[in-house]
Curated annotation (Swiss-Prot):
GO molecular function, one term: structural constituent of ribosome
HAMAP family in the cross-refs: Ribosomal_uS10
Lineage of the organism: Bacteria, Bacillati, Cyanobacteriota, Cyanophyceae, Gloeobacterales
Full protein name: Small ribosomal subunit protein uS10
GO cellular component: small ribosomal subunit
């Protein structure tokens, strides 16, 4: 019978990939400082949402503008977390543009 390992899965997403990579490095550094094994950041596919909008309010359907939003996503797994690791991750100050989802 295999031993079950305790694992924390952190899923991050943001519109700015630079901000996302900085946040990932902060999380991995914090995990390594508290003697937990961090795997990642693992890049997930970027979700691209495209919008097509008519430029004119009345006629000219041939004239359109295209906009898009790109959502960059990463996953970090932390194995063997201690109470010290969880406390350090809770105190971590991350930018407002990064959405974080934590699963135990």
């Amino acid at each position: 019978m295999a031993l079950t390992q305790q694992k924390i899965r952190i899923r991050l997403q943001a519109f700015d990939h630079g901000l996302l990579d900085q946040s990932c490095s902060k999380i991995v550094d914090t995990a390594n400082r508290t003697n937990a094994a961090a795997v990642g950041p693992i890049p997930l596919p970027t979700r691209i949402r495209r919008y097509c909008v008519l430029r004119s309010p009345h006629v000219d359907k041939d004239s359109r503008e295209h906009f898009e939003t790109r959502t960059h996503r990463r996953i970090i797994d932390i194995y063997q977390p201690s109470a010290k690791t969880i406390d350090a991750l809770m105190r971590l100050d991350l930018p407002a543009g990064v959405d974080i989802e934590v699963k135990l």
